[in-house]
Amino acid sequence: MTDPELDPQRRETIGRFFAAIQGGDYAALQEVLTPDAITRWPQSGERITGAMSCVRVYENYPGGPPSYAVHRISGGGDVWVAELVADYSDGRWYTVSVIEFDGPLIARMTDYFGPSFAAPEWRAAWVERDELTLEPGQSG
């Protein structure tokens, strides 16, 4: 459904998704997903099928669930994008999630993760530093 009246609700649903993971509220996490929701992690070649499998992944995360700082949520209709900083027990990762809805619920997500890295010197003459310094719990 591409009803523009759903856009504010969908933006809120995305926020609730990340807040539920961060807060360990797995009942709330399940509530924002379709029962057959699919999450893809292309960098590791993994696919999570079903809301319950998604819940189980986050329930069993070594070191606990990540903390998120949401930089931006943008989109409209059925397709949205969230840009985040995620702090895991093994470090900070920059994340982009492509989120697809079926009605008011999240039906598909594809998440891309990248660590920070030092900027190469050869580009220094043409670029300026741009630090995304959000802390977990902050949004930009």
Language-model segments: residues:
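C-terminal and inter-domain tail/linker signature
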Residues: 1-140
